Amino acid sequence: MDTNNLSLAASTWGFFFNREPETWLTIPQAIGELTSLGFGVEVWTNRGWDEAWLNRELVQEIVEACAGVSHISVHTRPEHWQWDPHGLSDEVEFCSMIGASALILHPNSLGLDGPSPRPDFPGIKRLAAQARARGVQLVLENTRDTMWALDLALDEIGDDPQKTNLGICIDVGHAYISQDAGREPIRNYLERYKGQLVHLHLHDNFGDADEHLPLGDGSIDWQDLADTLKAIDYRGPAVLELQRQGDLLAAFIDARDYLRSLGL
């Protein structure tokens, strides 16, 4: 793989998580901060956990902020971290409005959770068909210890994203804290789903908690990650999902420089 083949984006989430509400930017302002540095964006449509769905005026402001952005994805809202076909349908429509190519879903968004999951696979297929018609791909993200959920979805829906409109996002930080993928969980997650891999989430931790640290502040072996991505020839979007109480933009810039130094 040649250098600079990751399409780097950054998440708006870091501007709001664990920060005092009086310091929050608007969502369009957060998008503007990221795009001014040349990043694509992953849009979260909520700032606090309980923030209401977007009004028409705010949607239009987000549309304008996203105009001309290299890569746009949307992360599902917390209230849709359970199976809610109507709510997810609204998120698909929002993706289409702002030009987002992907809607990122946790397994529980598709009913893939609990001790005896019974997902509505026909409903998921209908949602995927709706998304395809809007130019949006559904992308299933691993959370902690969810290899079983990704496998089940691919077994039931199909493992060819071109046919199913369901791809996989490997969240490197989530893989690192997982106990279901052996001693090299990041490498094993990436290699297992390389045929469905259409998206990455990048952040660091120490292998025990989902801290979303800047790259290099935890214990993830980023050189090994780079080698694995080159080996599987991944050439797609990678979203920096970072939190920092200080200068968040500096963390994004440092992460980009570090990844480029690794040939990504």
Protein language model features and the residues they cover:
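Alpha-helix-loop-beta-strand connector modules within alpha/beta enzyme cores
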Residues: V59-H75, I124-R134, W222-L225
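Distinct, well-ordered alpha-helical segments
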Residues: E20-I27, A52-V63, W83-V92, G114-K125, ...
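N-terminal pre-domain/capping segments
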Residues: M1-S96, S101, L264
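Hydrophobic faces of well-ordered beta-strands that scaffold small-molecule active sites
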Residues: L6-W13, F39-V43, S70-T76, L103-L105, ...
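Active-site beta-loop-alpha junctions enriched in small/polar residues
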Residues: S11-N18, W44-G48, H75-E79, N108-L110, ...
